[in-house]
């Protein structure tokens, strides 16, 4: 993060800088072309013309992790594939974010067995989880919007915010 | 071509090798000795009248609690006659081994490797019997009945704290 | 068949290189590469740009579906079948349902049969559209990808109308369909049929006589019929070599013998012929969907699950009236139906090739063994045979034309 961190807390100057930097990051986040299984097809559907992802600046799917900043883990991660996922994540330069798309990436999905890693957050740190099997393209876009909001809240110090836990049930039953 | 014709042709040549004949829901399946299995497959493929040139499916089944414990099932199809016949051969622990159909039908290559990988059945005469679906250093054969499913306890609100404390989450 | 058929493994290519062979280079086309066919790893042995040998390394998507199905009842295991060949989930559902129905020996009502044929053919069209889009994308014809997905969205809307889910519908259950067809199903399908043949003409306009496309695909990746049968190559890949074998005509299921359609057959067995065969298959599928729609309209409303109450549950309102229905419902929900001891194998023509399902039952509510004969897994064996002597760019086109789906390869 360089100069912004060294400039310290200069009040209004750093706040505006934060906003500008985060705005720049959200509006042209390049995803890594990383489709594993069925969710990849819905990701392709989200990229296609009906649920266009290029209006969010994500038209270019970079094949090389060195040129990408968002890894959408779309699909089930098997035990053979887990080291590959980790290696690709390590090869991505900072700043980088990870969206776990689909139930298999979030928690292992319907495959609770020897072959599938129960949630890709055992392999890479995840920022946003998108539920669904597979999630509709609109759900993926909702996840991407949530990630954009999370990025907009990022501070210059570079410290990652702690995950927002929902402790109370979402529906209050009286 | 129907079940009776092919059964008669096989009985003529391999009567000693046929251990069982079963016709269930219109499908003919024969259980052979290992020697008969290979010879019958070759005969069915090469005989000009029968022409079962297409090996459609080859897989293994683990009948835990039965002797022989494992069984390899091969479905041969004749495209000309539009008919299918099933050859079965049993093999037992400790080292289940069955003749390989790969020299006769190259399509059996991956299917036998998969059966070896998941069930541990060895195939004599296979050019390269190695693991295919699981990582090379995996120990065990998952599809065997005595291999556990490997499932994780499902997290509900009452036990999630305990489960998540032990799960190897990655933080950076 | 001039040279002997070999299916190399990655170790067979890597070990001599490690031991010191320097005439050829070993290159890894890793599990992550910019081709949307999934996590397939290829180990290439190259002499400059020319491929001397290629060995697929699969297993990066192994999900243990067959083992997991053994721990679920028959009906619950249907959802796992969707996720194998994820471009044609309804085909997987159909294959598994047919295999278990063969074990159970149940009658499926006419309305369900026609709906199964209709939706399976729509699924075939949508799968071929993804194939076309990704194949063209691999060869840098990007507009076709966007056009194909436009039609696919229409088909996915139909699936959503019928089952609630766009892709993993699990709509074909053992005994019939999950729910009855909604009232606006036939008009929606007819709306789709109104546009479809002209859209296929659009794709053909872009590609079939395009000199760039012809340059990349004609004469590339040739395989002859005898090698194809020996290697177990099925589907459009086999029909492109001249063998007119389609399970829908050879061993018909679900009433396919009553529909009139043709089997497109190629001549040379190269990538261009596979392309032509699949485009023609899309047209034939449209024809079948038209016939099925007319039949549905004529048949009118009716039951969509078998009347055998030991297999399919009774309608909910009967439970309050009849003790027998209540008991059937209870047994089905707590235990599940129990097929007789035995085994059954059924194969269908999925968009990838011959998809087979081998089910073994031991008389309990859970299957003893389920095995899927996955066409993509077996088709991959022919890659080395077809790619020898071609260049790496041809290999990309070759994989796309084989149309593998890694979910099915690894199960």
From Swiss-Prot, chain A:
Keyword Glycosyltransferase: no
GO cellular component, one term: respiratory chain complex I
Annotated catalysed reactions: a quinone + NADH + 5 H(+)(in) = a quinol + NAD(+) + 4 H(+)(out)
Residue numbers binding [4Fe-4S] cluster: 38-39, 104, 133
One function term, GO molecular function aspect: 4 iron, 4 sulfur cluster binding
Cofactor note: Binds 1 [4Fe-4S] cluster.
GO BP terms in the entry: aerobic respiration; electron transport coupled proton transport
Cofactor: [4Fe-4S] cluster
Enzyme Commission designation: 7.1.1.-
Domain of life: Bacteria
Stored Pfam families: Oxidored_q6 (PF01058)
Family to which the UniProt record says this protein belongs: Belongs to the complex I 20 kDa subunit family.
Purpose of the protein: NDH-1 shuttles electrons from NADH, via FMN and iron-sulfur (Fe-S) centers, to quinones in the respiratory chain. The immediate electron acceptor for the enzyme in this species is believed to be ubiquinone. Couples the redox reaction to proton translocation (for every two electrons transferred, four hydrogen ions are translocated across the cytoplasmic membrane), and thus conserves the redox energy in a proton gradient.
Alphabetized NCBIfam families for the sequence: nuoB_fam, PRK06411.1
The protein's name in its UniProt record: NADH-quinone oxidoreductase subunit B 2
From Swiss-Prot, chain C:
Membrane topology: Peripheral membrane protein
Main location group: membrane
InterPro entries the UniProt entry points to: NADH_Q_OxRdtase_suD (IPR001135), NADH_UbQ_OxRdtase_49kDa_CS (IPR014029), NDH1_su_D/H (IPR022885), NiFe-Hase_large (IPR029014)
MF terms (GO), sorted A to Z: NAD binding; NADH:ubiquinone reductase (non-electrogenic) activity; quinone binding
Keyword annotations: Cell membrane, Membrane, NAD, Quinone, Translocase, Transport, Ubiquinone
EC number: 7.1.1.-
Record's catalysed reaction(s): a quinone + NADH + 5 H(+)(in) = a quinol + NAD(+) + 4 H(+)(out)
Superkingdom classification of source: Bacteria
PROSITE patterns found in the cross-reference section: COMPLEX1_49K
A GO CC annotation given for this chain: plasma membrane
Compartments reported by the entry: Cell membrane
Keyword Transport on entry: yes
Protein's job: NDH-1 shuttles electrons from NADH, via FMN and iron-sulfur (Fe-S) centers, to quinones in the respiratory chain. The immediate electron acceptor for the enzyme in this species is believed to be ubiquinone. Couples the redox reaction to proton translocation (for every two electrons transferred, four hydrogen ions are translocated across the cytoplasmic membrane), and thus conserves the redox energy in a proton gradient.
Family indicated by similarity: Belongs to the complex I 49 kDa subunit family.
HAMAP family: NDH1_NuoD (MF_01358)
Quaternary data: NDH-1 is composed of 14 different subunits. Subunits NuoB, C, D, E, F, and G constitute the peripheral sector of the complex.
Record-given protein name: NADH-quinone oxidoreductase subunit D 2
Gene: nuoD2
